[in-house]
Structures are given as structure tokens and as C-alpha cells.
Design a protein with these regions (language model features):
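Anionic-ligand anchoring segments at beta-strand to alpha-helix junctions in alpha/beta enzyme folds, i.e.
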Residues: 1-25
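Active-site cavity-forming subdomains of large catalytic enzyme subunits
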Residues: 23-179
Length: 180
């Protein structure tokens, strides 16, 4: 499922703002959008790549509702960073912990260095919890849950594996509700 077929709100971007109130309804919006797309497309099978907090839940519920062969892969979490001054490891929690500081330069440095790359949330919050859950219930291969977003396997290995898994599911008529 290509990203343009779903709408999502990022908790990480909205956190602490008045727009955060739109976050939870993002699950339903993703579900509704994906259900409409899957129902209208006539696809025999679906590979859904999900990111951020709410799309995994909305996607899983749509796939279960639609009940045609499908598999999910997350985009992977962002890697932690290194503080350029202290050489100590940093992560998303580091940004939260320093938020109350009056040192604006320190806050900016930590915010920029704590999550230096790309990927979904690097903490054990909704995103990683849901990816683990989706893997445990059998809708995402477990070895695809935790590698970070920039892990080369996400582009070089996992897509071919997903196609093989989905092809097998289509041939054997294995549907999401048979798995979950």
C-alpha cells in the first residue's frame, strides 16, 4: 500500500501542541481510507508499509476487516544519536529530559543530535509497541520489527521476502483472520 493511499498524523511532530487532539482519530482515518482503497482496488493481496504511531493500528484493523491476503512491514525506528560535546549516547528521551532547561543552545543541540537520521519513533512508545504486537500476532515477520529505518535489509532483502510471503498467502488463501 503506497503512502498516498492513507492519511496519518505524526504524534512526534504534534506532541505538546493543540493539534495533538487530532492524533487519536488518525487510526480511524487510516482505517477508513485503507478500507475504501482495498475494497475498490480488487487487489488479490496487500503489502502495507507503515510508519509513525497511528497508521499501524488503522492499517491492521483495515486489513483484518478487508480479510484478503496481506502482510505488514514497519518503516523501522530511528537510530539514537551521539552528543557532539560529551560523546554520550542520546535518544528521543534525551530531548524530553532536557526540555525544561533554560539553556536554549543545549536544547537545540540535543534535539538535533538525539535523532540524527530518519525513521519512526525511537522510544518504546505506541509505534514500537504496536510493531511488536503486529509481529507477535503474525501479521509482520518478527525479524522485520526492530531493525532501524536505515538498515539496508529494509530495501535490499525485506521486499523480496514480503513478496514471497504474500505470494504463498495468496496461493494458499491464507487471510489475516486465519492468522490473528
Amino acid at each position: 500500500v503506497q503512502p498516498e493511499y492513507t492519511v496519518a498524523t505524526s504524534d512526534g511532530i504534534r506532541n505538546g501542541t493543540k493539534e495533538m487532539r487530532y492524533s487519536l482519530i488518525g487510526r480511524e482515518v487510516t482505517n477508513d481510507t485503507l478500507c475504501e482503497h482495498l475494497s475498490a482496488s480488487g487487489l488479490e493481496g496487500t503489502i502495507a508499509v507503515v510508519a509513525c504511531d497511528k497508521p499501524p493500528v488503522g492499517t491492521l484493523s483495515a486489513i483484518l476487516e478487508h480479510n484478503r491476503p496481506a502482510i505488514i512491514m514497519s518503516d523501522g525506528p530511528i537510530r539514537p544519536g551521539i552528543d557532539s560535546v560529551t560523546n554520550e549516547p542520546l535518544d528521543i528521551i534525551s530531548s524530553y529530559q532536557i526540555a525544561g532547561s533554560e539553556d536554549e543552545e543545549l536544547k537545540r543541540r540535543i534535539a538535533c543530535e538525539a535523532c540524527p537520521g530518519y525513521g519512526s519513533c525511537g522510544g518504546m512508545f505506541t509505534y514500537n509497541t504496536m510493531q511488536t504486537f503486529i509481529g507477535v500476532v503474525g501479521m509482520q515477520p518478527l525479524h522485520m520489527v526492530s531493525p532501524p529505518s536505515d538498515d539496508k535489509r529494509r530495501l535490499d532483502v525485506f521486499p523480496d521476502q514480503l513478496i514471497t510471503y504474500l505470494d504463498n498467502m495468496v496461493k494458499k488463501d491464507i487471510k489475516p483472520r486465519d492468522i490473528v
